[in-house]
UniProtKB/Swiss-Prot annotation:
Entry's Gene Ontology cellular component terms: cortical actin cytoskeleton; perinuclear region of cytoplasm; transport vesicle
Bias-annotated ranges (Basic and acidic residues): 697-736, 753-838
Subcellular location: Cytoplasm; Cytoplasm, Perinuclear region; Cytoplasmic vesicle, Secretory vesicle
One Pfam short name: FYVE_2
InterPro entries tied to this protein: FYVE_2, Intracell_Transport_Effector, Myrip/Melanophilin, Rab_BD, Znf_FYVE_PHD, Znf_RING/FYVE/PHD
Keyword Chloroplast found: no
Domain RabBD: 4-124
Subunit structure: Interacts with prkar2aa.
Name of the protein: Rab effector MyRIP
Entry annotated with the keyword Coiled coil: yes
Gene that encodes the chain: myrip
GO molecular function: actin binding; myosin binding; small GTPase binding; zinc ion binding
Coiled-coil segments on the chain, per record: 188-237, 714-833
Length: 838
């Protein structure tokens, strides 16, 4: 095999006969591969299945990798295969005495496949010889054919990519590589050989990709080549056939490596020797001097039809002697042939490895063939050759897909979503915003940086919660204060309000549960000239500090649900408190104008927010219906004034009996009952305390009417009072009815919800029952099918028994016939003997 083979002395008929023999050899190999393809496919499927099972944690330690049966200590012990090193059971392996170990069934089958396909022979021969067998014969015949046509040798002894096991190489040293380029056969033979070459190339590419079991990219590549195998074979075969046809039509193009470009065209179209590495030639020389015509006996130069320099700027590698005119036909032929070469080169060198230096100092990269026999240059203008189909990395494709997926958290709602304005979401959002604003204002007033910067005033002095720096350092009479201002909710911090800052209110568990109100509260000041004293402001600031500290400590210990209840009850109590305080301030102003009193100085007047409780109580008949409002709305103004000023004495007998005028108290009760009736679950989301403003306007009108009616006799006042008392009774009854209705409605809603939930549960149970029934029906059907199969088997057994009986009868009859025949024969013999004796 290693010796030189010279077939130049063969005649044309002998060469055709040799080519037929080679073609028959290829056909036989194809049939053999088709016969072994089924076994290969089974082994591939088994290998992929075992690979998936082995990736599961500790699967092979407890179960067999082949039949998945669990291991037991005595009945089914585990044994390790010598080839695949997987744990297998007793039934899936056999003992090898020569190797003294166990081998599984799949590994035995793979060994059998290797022996039948002669893989060991080809691997050893390819490693020792560059070309052998039919490939060597085809090379010599093709070289002889080219020499006869007048061209120099294209394929010297070491000119092609020989003996390569590369996964995508077409010129790989196989027996069918050079046969496709010969012209001593028909077009059908050319097509079959081209298809065979393409199939071998793609099969080698698949085999090499499957060898890398650890690389996921190689596994995906092998899977892709398996799926598109037929398409790739057709494309590769068409390119091979086109190349053969073009070479047959244009014999002058075969001389492209025997000429050198003129010197004036070096800048535009470089010569082959200028773009090819001298290491790419083995035992070869080239005469590429400018201006010299290549000799016919030029030394053998490595001509690689699969050069890696695929730059579009590179012209066709055809050289002509200077002075020879170039015709248009030759130019078109060269362009067509170079385009065909580029198409075939794109699929020819997928396995060549880069041998660039680390510093990448060379202008063009260097590639090396897998067998180490060839080194070629690659132009820096194009990317390095890849596999037949260049696929994306799996990680890159997964990341690209995941980048367009919407996150599951984007579609989930939360109580912090600004678009969710209904229910507890809006209330909690509003509480948090106002809590942050309130803590900012209260904390920033004690910050020295805040005091030296310009900020708008926080709130009016009448609110009593926050003190402006101007009101603290100036007189209350001269300092202007806004008449009305939207005041922040004083209980935004989680915790109950202090008794010295707010009127008393009952615990939420003691009062009737009312719908939640928004904490937007109006701060009405009907006396703009009346403000708090500076000393009062300082005391309030200290009280604010104490309350803030207490709130912080309570916030850490209290639970979230109790904080919500405290916020709800505080907001409800504060709404009524602010309205009552505003009306009392107006009442006080009117009394100051009519009754001469000695408490006109601002020092004796205290803010309504620091008034104490338990100075008065409503009448007993209304105490039950309005307990949650009257307790929070008790008006201790006149008692506080009386305690501060001993000279103060009310003139009206009604005022002597009660600390506050009874008519005013009735009006307040009436207004509070209206407020309670207007508040409902529907007003929680949409109302902005519009009823409070309307009630305030009505109160102002009634107070003015009351002031004008003071000059009338007492009888009218008593009649009005009686009528108002009746109205109050009616309204209180209506109030109780409404509360009962709302409570009944809530109960009904809860009952309906529970009923719906129970119905859904019953439906789920019914669905489960139906599924179980369907499963039982399927089981019954399967049981019936099994019974029918058993009946059929029994019928067949009975038929067989009947046939056996018939056969036995026939045998008996034949035996009887034979016995009769024997008797007849004996009788005849006896008769014959008797005759002879006679």
């Amino acid at each position: 095999m290693g010796r030189k083979l010279d077939l130049s002395g063969l005649s044309n008929n002998e060469a055709e006969h040799v080519l037929r023999v080679v073609q028959r050899d290829m056909q036989l190999r194809k049939k053999e591969e088709e016969r072994l393809s089924e076994m290969k496919q089974e082994l591939e499927e088994e290998g992929s299945r075992c690979l998936l099972l082995s990736k599961q944690q500790k699967f092979n330690e407890h179960c067999c990798i082949r039949c998945c049966s669990p291991f037991t200590f005595l009945l089914n012990p585990k044994r390790q295969c010598l080839d695949c090193h997987y744990n297998i059971c007793k039934s899936c392996c056999s003992y090898s005495q020569s190797e003294r170990g166990y081998i599984c069934a799949a590994c035995q089958k793979s060994r059998h496949l290797r022996t039948q396909s002669l893989e060991w022979f080809y691997n050893n021969v390819k490693s020792r010889f560059k070309r052998f067998g039919s490939a060597k014969v085809l090379k010599t015949l093709y070289r002889k054919h080219i020499i006869e046509r007048g061209a120099l040798s294209e394929l010297p002894e070491v000119s092609a990519h020989e003996g390569s096991n590369d996964n995508g190489s077409i010129c790989d040293g196989s027996d069918s590589t050079l046969y496709k380029q010969s012209e001593g056969h028909s077009m059908a033979d050319t097509l079959t050989v081209a298809l065979r070459v393409a199939e071998e190339a793609i099969e080698e590419a698949i085999a090499k990709a499957e060898n890398y079991k650890d690389s996921l990219e190689k596994q995906n590549e092998a899977r892709y080549l398996h799926e598109h195998k037929e398409e790739l074979i057709e494309e590769l075969a068409t390119t091979i056939v086109q190349k053969i046809i073009q070479r047959g039509k244009r014999p002058e193009i075969q001389e492209e490596y025997e000429f050198v470009w003129p010197q004036n065209q070096k800048s535009e179209l470089p010569s082959p020797t200028s773009t090819q590495n001298p290491l790419a030639t083995q035992n070869s020389h080239s005469t590429s001097q400018p201006g010299a015509v290549a000799q016919s006996d030029i030394s053998k130069r490595s001509r690689s039809a699969y050069s890696s320099d695929d730059s579009p700027e590179k012209g066709p590698e055809v050289g002509m002697a200077p002075g020879v005119p170039k015709s248009t036909e030759v130019e078109t032929d060269i362009q067509n042939y170079s385009s065909l070469r580029r198409e075939s080169r794109a699929l020819s060198l997928p396995g060549w490895k880069s041998v660039d230096r680390l510093e990448n100092s060379s202008a063009s990269s260097v590639l090396q063939s897998p067998d180490g026999n060839w080194i070629a240059l690659q132009s820096s203008q194009h990317s390095r050759p890849s596999l037949l189909t260049k696929r994306k990395s799996l990680v890159f494709s997964v990341l690209e897909k995941e980048s367009g997926v919407v996150s599951a958290y984007d579609e989930m709602g939360s109580d912090s979503d600004p678009e969710d304005q209904g229910g507890w979401g809006a209330a909690l959002l509003q509480f948090r915003r106002r809590l942050s604003d309130e803590t900012y204002y209260t904390d920033s007033q004690h910050d020295p940086e805040w005091t030296f910067t310009q900020h708008p005033p926080i709130t009016s002095p009448s609110s009593g919660q926050y003190t402006n720096t101007e009101t603290l350092n100036s007189d209350s009479e001269t300092s202007p204060s806004p008449s009305t201002r939207a005041r922040r909710a004083p209980v935004m911090k989680k915790g109950p309000p202090e008794t010295h800052l707010y009127p008393y209110y009952r615990h939420p568990a003691d009062i009737v549960a009312l719908p939640q109100l928004k904490p937007d509260v109006l701060d009405v000041n009907f006396n703009p000239h009346l403000g708090g004293d500076s000393s009062d402001g300082e005391e309030r600031s200290e009280q604010v500090k104490r309350s803030r500290r207490r709130r912080k400590s309570k916030r850490e210990t209290s639970e979230h649900s109790r904080a919500h209840n405290a916020l709800y009850s505080a907001a409800t109590a504060e709404n009524s408190t602010v309205l009552l305080n505003a009306m009392m301030m107006r009442r006080q102003q009117s009394q100051e104008n009519t009754v001469p009193l000695n408490h006109q100085t601002p020092d004796s007047v205290t803010s309504p927010d620091i008034l104490t409780f338990n100075n008065m109580s409503p009448e007993p008949e209304y105490q039950n219906t309005l307990a949650h409002n009257s307790s929070a709305a008790s008006l201790p103004l006149l008692s506080q004034l009386g305690s501060n000023n001993p000279g103060f004495a009310p003139q009206d007998p009604l005022l002597r009996a009660f600390p506050v005028n009874e008519t005013l108290e009735e009006e307040l009760k009436y207004k509070l009952s209206e407020l309670i009736g207007q508040v409902s679950e529907r007003d929680v989301k949409s109302s902005d305390f519009e009823p409070i403003s309307e009630v305030g306007n009505k109160q102002e009108d009634r107070v003015s009417e009351k002031d004008s009616g003071k000059l009338r006799p007492k009888e009218r006042r008593e009649s009005k009072r009686e009528s108002k008392l009746r109205e109050m009774e009616k309204q209180s009854e209506r109030q109780t009815v409404k509360l009962m209705d709302t409570s009944d409605a809530v109960r009904q809603i809860n009952i309906e919800r529970q009923m719906k939930k129970e119905r859904e549960r019953q439906r789920d149970i019914e669905r489960q029952v139906e599924r179980e029934r369907e499963r039982q029906r399927e089981l019954e059907k399967q049981i019936e099918k099994d019974r029918e199969r058993r009946r059929e088997i029994e019928m067949q057994v009975e038929k067989k028994q009947e046939r056996q009986k018939e056969m036995e009868k026939q045998l008996k009859q034949e035996q009887e016939r034979q016995s009769e025949i024997e008797r007849d024969l004996e009788k005849k013999r006896k008769s014959i003997r008797m005759e002879k004796r006679n």
